[in-house]
């Protein structure tokens, strides 16, 4: 395939697009204003120490992400700590301890809910109502709205919001419930909680986020004659008789 493709931004989406492009035989040029790839999920340096720029987890349902990681040479079995779905807090004071067993879906969720510590009857009923309603509507709410509105609609308790929904939304979407898309959030829940048990497994990175995928993705592209331009800002995109021009 003799196509020239320019990709603006070397976040995870840009890196994924570049990998797919060079794999299809395209001539790919990837532009990134920063000197480090990864976008909102990358390493940064604080006082000379490399740290992640945010807390991120993956879920077992992220099949295409995991496929791309393996494609660029990452051993996904070694790159993550694989945990069953859980939300655990320090036992003192006893706030909440929710852990699902490695049982077939949806029994793992039922068992986790029944055994959860720190949840009262109102919390359990609210959580059960949420999942029952989502399954009934096939995880489709129609017109989109912020996640916070969805939680209010399904009458989730303040404790569930603070200890379950808000942390889960931030971890999965890197966006607060006040701003995150409820449709996207439900799609994540559908893919992770509405299917196989392994889809809900929490994959906690054991390396920095840049090494987890972006750096390997860039090396993969360069090895296939792709061009990576870090530290270059695209300021102008125009179309003329010869095609698209990027400056």
At which residue positions do the language-model features occur?
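Glycine-rich active-site loop/strand segments that organize a redox cofactor
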Residues: 37, 41-60, 130-135
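Glycine-rich FAD pyrophosphate-binding loop
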Residues: 22-46
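Mobile amphipathic helical/loop "lid" adjacent to a hydrophobic cofactor/ligand pocket
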Residues: 65-66, 70, 75-182, 186
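N-terminal Rossmann-like dinucleotide/flavin-binding domain of flavoprotein oxidoreductases
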Residues: 57-73, 211-226
